[in-house]
């Protein structure tokens, strides 16, 4: 089922709603969608207790579909509620951010699915980069911050695109409620809003950052670059090793690279894979229904 098929099916269902409502007592529903981040009062922890302070955590979110059945994905032929737009979520802000309007019909919803602004369709060979991801340079997540490893403050940046892989159904949103997730709500139309709340601490919990800091000096006949804390060593097999203090240029020494302003978390790294897995199959965002005033 593609996003286009979902949308077409929903358009048809909307057109037939007067007839359907007479039979099922469903009503048209429109309510606000808000996205919310989490303000960290203290440094959060990456893998092995490494303290991390984030200065930026932008997530490209959407579209979002809420389904009647307990299992989302291709079993959700017609969404009960849907929001077809995208938004960049400031995941470090606890202030609700308006994202748009959810449209649909009343009734029970038991599952959800969403993309992170990179959407695959059966009719397209390549995933479509939607507005929010485009604003982040074609990525679903941009993280910036510092980690403290063995007393060394390590600036880092991660840019993570999240899109369909060969292991998922083509054309179906990439993040879906699992059978173990608790999600149930009877949509009545009295709701004021649905809030989707993200906590970036959950994305970093499995990210390994210690390996970027190294305490090593040149060995006999060794070549290449090694780091001894903040000191970069260029090793010479003849013993004419050359060192420089990275901190003198306000840089850090990154294992395997040498002096640099910050760590760029590469797509081939374990840290990158951990971030992507956290977004697709890790801790879920919290869905909070805000009831309207009586």
Q: Which residues does each predicted region cover?
A:
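Bacterial N-terminal signal peptides that target proteins for export
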Residues: 1-12
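Short, intrinsically disordered low-complexity segments
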Residues: 2-3, 243, 256, 275
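Generic secretory/membrane-interface signal
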Residues: 5, 205-210, 228-230
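Short, flexible active-site loop motifs that bind/organize anionic cofactors or intermediates
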Residues: 11, 54, 236
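Detector for methionine-enriched segments
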Residues: 11-14, 113
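C-terminal motif of bacterial Sec signal peptides marking the signal peptidase cleavage site
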Residues: 17-20
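A short, solvent-exposed, low-complexity linear motif enriched for acidic/polar residues
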Residues: 22-219, 260-294
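Cysteine-rich, disulfide-bonded extracellular modules and peptides in secreted proteins
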Residues: 218-260
